[in-house]
């Protein structure tokens, strides 16, 4: 299996064992092959903390299934910013664009729980998990 990128919605679905995670590669493969942008990691962490999970517990929960965290560097920021015209009609956030930019940069598939992403044609496979 090759690397693949997870967005925050997919990471949260995996951590909370929500419907749709069965369409993703097996847990052992996620640990070894997933990559997530530091922006999306912060987003997932924030959502768990907002649900009342203590910050340290939330951090441990989201870090457990992750293979690699990609720093949001200037090159990544430029690519994410450049996606605004291709994505704004769908209402994608900066976090969404950071995720997509990482997948484009790495040339790998991306997994999301956001159905609207299926309308994108960015030259990378986009897998909607539900």
Where are the model-predicted features located?
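Active-site neighborhoods of divalent-metal-dependent phosphate/nucleic-acid chemistry enzymes
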Residues: 68-111
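Acidic, PIN/NYN-like endoribonuclease modules and their adjacent C-terminal/linker elements
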Residues: 1-3, 69, 100, 104-130
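Glycine/charged-rich beta-loop-alpha catalytic/anionic-binding loops adjacent to active sites
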Residues: 25-27, 61-63, 81-86
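Short, structured coil segments at secondary-structure junctions
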Residues: 30, 65, 122-123
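Short, hinge-like loop/turn segments at secondary-structure boundaries
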Residues: 51-55, 87-88, 127-130
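Short, well-structured N-terminal submotif of metal-dependent ribonuclease cores
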Residues: 1-36, 48-60
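Alpha-helix capping/helix-boundary segments
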Residues: 10-11, 40, 76, 98-99, ...
């Amino acid at each position: 299996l090759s690397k693949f990128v997870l967005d925050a919605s997919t990471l949260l679905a995996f951590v909370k064992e929500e419907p749709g995670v069965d369409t993703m590669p097996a847990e052992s493969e996620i640990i070894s092959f997933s990559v997530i942008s530091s922006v999306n990691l912060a987003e997932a962490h924030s959502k768990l903390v907002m649900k009342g999970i203590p910050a340290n517990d939330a951090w441990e929960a989201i870090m457990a299934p992750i293979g690699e965290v990609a720093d949001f560097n200037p090159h990544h920021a430029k690519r994410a910013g450049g996606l605004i015209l291709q994505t704004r009609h769908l209402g994608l956030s900066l976090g969404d664009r950071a995720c997509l930019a990482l997948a484009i940069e790495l040339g790998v598939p991306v997994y999301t729980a956001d159905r609207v992403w299926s309308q994108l044609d960015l030259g990378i496979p986009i897998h909607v998990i539900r």
